[in-house]
């Protein structure tokens, strides 16, 4: 199949842009964006993903207001025939590339669901390409993907359950990743080692537990990102980050240290601090405290989401499928589900206020504490 993109001179192999070179069913390509008000009383999480080898395109719009509920809208439909322009779309939701690597617009039209949104994202620092994410378990390559990410600001509006919020320079963050990751497409082969599960990254440590922390941060003057992955004993296997004096060049992070104060009885942080050693000899200090509630990511369809429990990238319907639910987030860590059951998700990503070298700003702080974690004195889970 030919598309307009095939007129360009940017092919990466002997295939058209309608297909991918990998035959792995898990191959994905995702745009994801978050934004939240300075006080954390309102926030959104939005994304669209294409699974070319599963003939599926999915989208999600998740919102929280006043720190007590998470509203979830999920879409899934066949990918083909698909649009070959620069716009990602699924049903009533789309993400437009206004200025590549700088400005995007995400919209969800009003419908028979509790969220409507029109937000324009603009980067405050350049998009940063991470080191490749790769991993094997029992000889099988389970991860092989790329990601770039960017700290920015969001302007526009959001309506949630009839309440309207105007966004003026809300903190925003986005990532775009593509490749192969575990827990996509409905099944993952078992090869001998049981993993802690919960997030795709848990496969990278087998049965040794996972600690992952990421900061995307800005106070308008200084901004940047840092990601660390370690196993449960503290052995580090991934470090990637760079910082900016806004308007200046990137400065690489060469080492980092973290200190976590946990909320009692949970694996959520009350305070997360980082020291970043930079290539220019400086050390930057970050101190984040939660506002709002950490996203329960299965509401987006990831991590065994959707009503069928199969998670992302599964062919579900020959027409547009729409799912809607609302979670009670009033407890610190436990999610009260609409059917009266409870869940304790492993994949949480937190909105925060963050001091950056003593100057207050905001940060987006995913933190996964999965499996055995003896160094933190946490009971096994």
Q: Could you say what each language-model-derived stretch is?
A:
Residues 1-381:
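Structured soluble/peripheral alpha/beta segments that form catalytic or ligand/cofactor-binding pockets
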């Amino acid at each position: 199949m030919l598309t307009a993109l095939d007129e360009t001179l940017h092919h990466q192999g002997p295939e058209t842009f309608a297909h991918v070179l990998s035959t792995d069913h898990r191959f994905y390509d995702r745009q994801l964006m978050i934004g939240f008000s300075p006080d954390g009383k309102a926030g959104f999480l939005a994304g669209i993903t294409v699974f070319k080898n599963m003939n599926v395109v999915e989208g999600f719009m998740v919102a929280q207001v006043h720190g007590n509920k998470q509203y979830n809208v999920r879409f899934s439909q066949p990918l083909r025939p698909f649009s070959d322009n620069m716009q990602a779309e699924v049903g009533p939701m789309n993400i437009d590339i206004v200025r590549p690597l700088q400005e995007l617009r995400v919209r969800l039209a009003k419908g028979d669901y509790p969220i409507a949104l029109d937000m324009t994202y603009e980067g405050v620092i350049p998009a940063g390409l991470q080191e490749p994410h790769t991993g094997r378990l029992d000889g099988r390559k389970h991860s092989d993907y790329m990601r770039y990410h960017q700290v920015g600001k969001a302007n526009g509006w959001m309506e949630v359950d009839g309440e309207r919020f105007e966004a003026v320079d809300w903190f925003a963050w986005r990532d775009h990743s593509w490749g192969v990751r575990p827990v996509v497409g409905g099944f993952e082969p078992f090869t001998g080692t049981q993993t802690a599960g919960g997030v795709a990254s848990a496969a990278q440590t087998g049965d040794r537990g996972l600690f992952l922390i990421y900061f995307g941060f800005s106070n308008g003057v200084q901004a940047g990102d840092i990601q660390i992955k370690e196993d449960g004993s503290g052995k580090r296997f991934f470090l990637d980050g760079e910082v900016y004096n806004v308007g200046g060049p990137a400065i690489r992070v060469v080492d980092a240290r973290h200190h976590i104060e946990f909320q009692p009885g949970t694996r959520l942080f009350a305070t997360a601090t980082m020291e970043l050693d930079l290539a220019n000899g400086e050390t930057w200090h970050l101190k984040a405290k939660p506002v709002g509630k950490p996203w329960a990511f299965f509401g987006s369809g990831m991590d065994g989401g959707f009503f069928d429990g199969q998670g992302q990238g599964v062919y579900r319907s020959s027409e547009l499928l729409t799912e809607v639910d609302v979670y009670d987030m009033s407890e610190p860590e436990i999610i009260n589900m609409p059917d009266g059951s409870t869940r304790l998700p492993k994949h949480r990503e937190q909105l925060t206020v963050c001091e950056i070298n003593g100057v207050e700003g905001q940060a987006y702080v995913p933190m996964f504490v999965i499996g055995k974690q003896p160094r933190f004195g946490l009971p096994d889970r």
